[in-house]
């Protein structure tokens, strides 16, 4: 058995020398499936590595103290706390700008007082600690940050790069465990670079070291700080789902190529069996062939996936930073298990795609192998099985939907993806039976039109070879329509929401201690119609009381205070109230609160429920008057009237929205404010600028989604093109007799295009309702479970028309090259094809 295997393998592979198009089709499917999946996983692996490094440093390992009034802490306050024996440590945080304009986070610490459990403190040896603490000090950074400083890794140790403002960093020391785009140095060196004087950003301590905050400070426990990995989990799950979809579409190409190759090698397999090769040996050799080709395609795909990840990583990093404040390195950091996992997934997909082919080849006996129609003879039974499989997939989708209806709105993210996957599978399995039914009806209608009747019958013969490519096209079209409609609806909702929230033409952000003076000054300005003061603080949601039960939670939340003035309340959107908008705002003025949709979804809250909130030294019981949308915020938020928030939680001011009279001179007011209170250039922001920044963030957020959607559609087009190219020779053999009977080549070429265009049009018709169902699943289930907000369902007729047009155009483009080859074929070549019949 093993002695003859090399000869049998060489014989099987010789088929691809005669049919290189099929080999290209098979490798193409493996390549694109592996490339898109590996690219997504490379992005996810790099992001999670960045999160792990950030978590190990400070964010979730230290309790944090800040001043209750929002004013900056000072070294004197820190020294006073140390003198009382409290185990606290100072921290200074700011930003520096490199010469290429990149902003890096600079953190100054005192490692002598920092908790010994912290990752940085553990990394210091006595020698390195001395260098870290004394001039010229050290700058510790991850290798990812070197590119922003314009320094090669080999030249980094000991280098002192110059920043955009001309200042020089202390000598560099590489620390791979640090998060990306972060510089760590002694607090004295950081104070010089940031020119912070006596101010520090916060005071920290080991988790649980202090039972309560010292007087005048607020305490945020390490356990209450959400990690970047927790906040971004749903984002990465969405990316994984898109990568998995592209992987499945790529496997359709592989499946089609394997089936076509086996059909065309039936005579070869018969000969090998007659020569004494056993069925088991043949299947083992076919498996070895699959493994060899799979390794080639998978390795090429993984290499391409890394290139794709490098291309998309900057946009993903910008999105995660904008949405979640999560820093992600700009360089790929791939562990060994990424490479092994990518290879395993690619080969596993090949086994999945090839198992059916191997099983059917093993079951064909020698007599059947001699029949060239043996493969096609079972297709009618396959259509029946596809119909039954589609019905089963639809039943699973309906069962998941029924189960989701019984769950709280924020649960069921994985089940939601399962529901969409089941709908895609059901539709894909039903497509070939639907096409077969349409062709059967057309054959009956065209029985008196010989050429059209032949074209329909010919399409029925092509259907077994084209069905997988059409299924891939259906999935890609429906996904494009579904995701495109979701993004378009989100854009409309988001822009409308911005218009409702941003009612003031000018917004002021100033140091907390200046707000009282600024507010008093603005009260005397004739051009100011209304001042909308906002406040921010943090609290813990301890318990929720509903008519049915009381629940203990301990959930950290944001507190946000607004001024319910005449300019704001008519526009502020509310999703749910107990007794109407007017009653909700009246209750809000008297101390009731609104909760954002994220918190209401996560904790199953509704108007009328009571909340018990606590903060250091404060405990309040409040009633919910309404639920409001809060797109883009990953955290739960409780909204209060600004005076109520100041009185109950001593929250400092955070901004003032200035509503002006129509004839106000905005430029003069800006200049007067800036001069009077010595404000920085970024203290005043107009409404248009805020909207522009928000819209840029929105567009950047969906850049990778659009890219993956386009790539998935391109993969489906390649699947169809590869299927047509691989069978181009057999198609010429089928068309040559018609040419010999007098049908012009141009007419046959156009007829071939019409066949594919019609099949693609039917596929596009099925993709439209499927795309609408996907849009519904995304806005009603996936978004609610992943982000906490539900979007309105928008349908775009133009998008549907584009879907139909795209289906036809993709099919025509895929069929154009084979049709052109036939059109240009010489009469001698066509006569030779006819003679072979």
Q: Where do the protein language model's features map onto the residues?
A:
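Membrane transport/envelope proteins' first extracytoplasmic loop
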Residues: 2-251, 260-263, 279, 314, ...
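Alpha-helical transmembrane segments, especially those used as permease/efflux helices
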Residues: 2-6, 10-25, 234-237, 337-357, ...
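Interfacial "coupling" helices/loops that link adjacent transmembrane helices in transporter permeases
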Residues: 19, 252-294, 373, 718-761
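Juxtamembrane segments of multi-pass membrane proteins
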Residues: 65-70, 427-581, 597, 609
């Amino acid at each position: 058995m093993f002695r003859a295997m090399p000869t049998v393998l060489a014989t099987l592979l010789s088929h691809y020398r005669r049919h290189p198009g099929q080999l290209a089709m098979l490798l193409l499917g493996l390549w694109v499936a592996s490339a898109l999946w590996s690219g997504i996983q490379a992005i996810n692996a790099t992001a999670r590595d960045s999160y792990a490094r950030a978590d190990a440093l400070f964010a979730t390992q230290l309790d944090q103290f800040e001043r209750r009034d929002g004013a900056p802490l000072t070294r004197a306050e820190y020294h006073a706390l140390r003198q009382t024996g409290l185990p606290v440590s100072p921290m200074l945080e700011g930003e520096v700008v490199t010469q290429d304009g990149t902003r890096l986070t600079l953190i100054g610490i005192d490692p002598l007082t920092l908790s010994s459990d912290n990752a940085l403190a553990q990394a210091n040896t006595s020698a390195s600690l001395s260098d870290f603490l004394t001039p010229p000090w050290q700058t510790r950074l991850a290798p990812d940050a070197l590119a922003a400083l314009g320094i090669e890794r080999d030249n980094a140790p000991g280098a002192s790069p110059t920043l955009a403002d001309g200042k020089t960093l202390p000598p560099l020391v590489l620390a791979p465990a640090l998060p990306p785009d972060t510089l760590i140095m002694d607090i004295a060196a950081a104070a010089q670079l940031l020119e912070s004087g006596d101010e520090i950003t916060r005071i920290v301590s080991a988790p649980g070291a202090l039972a309560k905050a010292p007087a005048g400070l607020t305490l945020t426990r390490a356990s209450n700080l959400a990690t970047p990995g927790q906040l971004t989990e749903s984002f990465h799950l969405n990316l994984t789902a898109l990568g998995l979809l592209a992987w499945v579409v790529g496997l359709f190409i592989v499946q089609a190529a394997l089936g076509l190759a086996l059909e065309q090698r039936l005579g070869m397999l018969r000969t090998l069996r007659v020569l004494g090769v056993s069925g088991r040996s043949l299947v083992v050799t076919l498996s070895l062939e699959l493994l060899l080709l799979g390794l080639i395609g998978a390795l090429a795909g993984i290499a391409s996936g890394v290139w794709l990840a490098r291309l998309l990583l900057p946009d993903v990093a910008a999105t995660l930073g904008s949405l979640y404040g999560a820093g992600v390195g700009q360089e790929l950091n791939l562990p060994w298990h990424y490479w092994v996992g990518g290879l395993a997934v690619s080969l596993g997909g090949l086994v999945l795609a090839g198992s059916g082919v191997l099983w059917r080849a093993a079951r064909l006996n020698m007599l059947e192998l001699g029949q060239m129609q043996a493969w096609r003879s079972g297709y009618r039974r396959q259509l029946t099985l596809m119909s039954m499989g589609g019905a089963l997939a639809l039943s699973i989708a309906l069962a998941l939907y029924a189960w989701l209806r019984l769950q709280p709105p924020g649960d069921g993210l994985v089940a939601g993806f399962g529901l969409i996957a089941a709908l895609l599978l059901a539709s894909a399995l039903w497509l070939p039976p639907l096409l077969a039914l349409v062709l059967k009806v057309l054959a009956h209608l065209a029985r008196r039109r010989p050429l059209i009747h032949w074209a329909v019958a010919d399409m029925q013969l092509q259907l077994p070879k084209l069905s997988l490519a059409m299924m891939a096209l259906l999935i890609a079209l429906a996904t494009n329509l579904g995701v495109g409609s979701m993004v378009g609806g989100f854009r409309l909702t988001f822009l409308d929401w911005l218009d409702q929230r941003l009612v003031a033409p000018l917004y002021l952000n100033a140091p907390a201690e200046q707000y009282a003076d600024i507010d008093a000054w603005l009260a005397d300005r004739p051009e100011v119609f209304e001042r909308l003061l906002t406040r921010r603080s943090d609290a813990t949601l301890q318990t929720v009381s509903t008519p049915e039960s009381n629940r203990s939670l301990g959930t950290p939340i944001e507190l946000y205070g607004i001024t319910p003035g005449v300019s704001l309340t008519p526009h502020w959107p509310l999703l749910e109230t107990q007794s109407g908008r007017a009653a909700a705002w009246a209750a809000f003025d008297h101390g009731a609160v609104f909760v954002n949709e994220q918190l209401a979804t996560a904790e199953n809250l509704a108007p009328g429920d009571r909340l018990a909130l606590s903060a250091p030294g404060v405990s309040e019981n409040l009633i919910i008057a309404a639920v409001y949308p809060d797109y883009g915020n990953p955290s739960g938020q409780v909204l209060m009237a600004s005076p109520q928030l100041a009185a109950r939680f001593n929250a400092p001011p955070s901004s003032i929205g200035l509503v002006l009279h129509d004839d106000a001179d905005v430029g003069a007011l800006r200049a007067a404010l800036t001069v009077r209170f010595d404000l920085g250039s970024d203290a005043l922001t107009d409404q248009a600028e805020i909207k522009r920044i928000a819209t840029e963030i929105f567009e950047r957020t969906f850049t990778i989604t659009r890219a993956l959607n386009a790539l998935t559609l391109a993969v489906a087009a390649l699947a169809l093109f590869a299927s047509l190219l691989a069978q181009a020779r057999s198609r010429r053999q089928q068309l040559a007799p018609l040419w010999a009977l007098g049908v012009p080549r141009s007419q046959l070429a156009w007829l071939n295009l019409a066949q594919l265009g019609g099949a693609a049009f039917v596929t596009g018709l099925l993709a439209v309702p499927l795309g609408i169902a996907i849009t519904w699943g995304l806005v009603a289930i996936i978004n609610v479970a992943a982000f906490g907000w539900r979007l309105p369902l928008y349908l775009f007729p133009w998008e549907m028309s584009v879907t139909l047009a795209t289906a036809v155009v993709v099919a025509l483009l895929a069929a154009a090259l084979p049709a052109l080859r036939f059109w240009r074929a010489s009469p001698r070549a066509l006569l030779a094809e006819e003679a072979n019949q």
